[in-house]
Regions:
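A short, proline-enriched helix->beta-strand linker immediately N-terminal to the Walker B motif
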Residues: 63-66
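Conserved ABC ATPase signature
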Residues: 44-48
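Signature (C-motif/LSGGQ) region and adjacent switch/coupling loops
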Residues: 37-41
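ABC-type ATPase nucleotide-binding domains, specifically the catalytic core motifs of the NBD
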Residues: 4-24, 33-35
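Hydrophobic anchor residue at the start of the ABC signature
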Residues: 58
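Active-site beta-strand/loop architecture of penicillin-binding DD-peptidases
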Residues: 30
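ABC ATPase nucleotide-binding domain signature region
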Residues: 53-55
């Protein structure tokens, strides 16, 4: 997680090796799983609470889909 980047940027960074369509679909999936995170799209990760940061970290892992 990059504290100086916002939620959407962090999710895009997590999927940088994937195709754009896949990343977009994965990000939508993350926002469906974590509706609270979708409301924080423009918030910098460093200014989020610990629980919100955990949601973002899990969301980033889901974008990668190992």
């Amino acid at each position: 997680m990059f504290p100086e980047s916002d939620v959407l940027e962090n999710l895009k960074i997590a999927g940088y090796l994937k195709k754009r369509k896949e990343v977009k679909a994965s990000i939508e999936y993350v926002f469906d799983m974590f509706p609270a995170l979708s409301k924080l799209k423009t918030r910098k990760a460093g200014f989020m609470s610990g629980g919100e940061q955990q949601m973002l970290a899990i969301g980033m892992a889901l974008v990668v889909r190992p």
